[in-house]
């Protein structure tokens, strides 16, 4: 079914307008000409290259077969005025068989460059990619504004996965599930078939994500899971088994820890690092792993896929090639990689070492 087959009732449209969805409603308006038929979502995306390009796994209970390597919305995709680099990376990813693209309403600052670049490709290749975005807002109304703008920038009338971004503390969870909280927006948009599935994401502490999972049966979880994880505030110990038990789609991120786990990473000068987000934990030396080791560690965990941002087409092609060649590591190999990651685990998990409310 094509996107043009979508229809929406006038009641649905009125409700979405109440939520501040004027722009999105305008995008859907042509379908109103078909009358009072119920809006339906198109079939799941399908990239015909994926099964030949890399192994696939079930994305939880969503019914989607996702390639084990997926494209993250940061790196080149979040840089300002970087269309000539970012858009070809996205196009090439789809050509290579990537069938899941991650982005967020906060990637690229107020201009939301990441969603802009992804949208330029989705305008003509929407049916080939499972499209995921996020809201970091904690209220219903602010999240409604976020999804409205996301749809506009992504040049689509629906997203396959809408996620609560960076759920780090119980304070976040309580805000999200409070009356007027962001969870209301997620449920409304799913009911109105503006979003297909719901998820949550996090990289700070496992307890908050576990509490979120207990409060609502989310379809997916996007969690930081690299070879440094077992050494500091581990997500592997309790969060990962809970997500597996709930049969969630599990998406791994922060695989190379912004490069800091990798032996070929060149540290920036310390004074430069201090001005960066990563600078909350300084990294004076390179890492200890190859990209193959870092990637295969996470893919040997019970994940559906991993998202990795790429700075160049060459980097993208290397990652897809590694995914194509993947075979699971033995327990002994996993233990050896974890042990070698220990000296650089804290810099590779820098996102777990800053103050949160």
Q: Model-predicted segments: where are they?
A:
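N-terminal secretory signal peptides
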Residues: 1-12
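N-terminal twin-arginine translocation
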Residues: 10-15, 25-46
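N-terminal amphipathic alpha-helix/helix-capping segment at the start of soluble metabolic enzymes
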Residues: 41-70
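Conserved, mostly hydrophobic/aromatic
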Residues: 59, 71, 101, 118, ...
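Glycine-rich, proline-tolerant flexible connector loops at the mouths of alpha/beta enzymes
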Residues: 102-120, 170-171
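Alpha-helix-loop-beta-strand connector modules within alpha/beta enzyme cores
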Residues: 115-132, 184-188
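Glycine/proline-rich, positively charged
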Residues: 138-227, 231-234, 238, 244-251
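Structured C-terminal cap/extension of enzyme domains
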Residues: 237-357
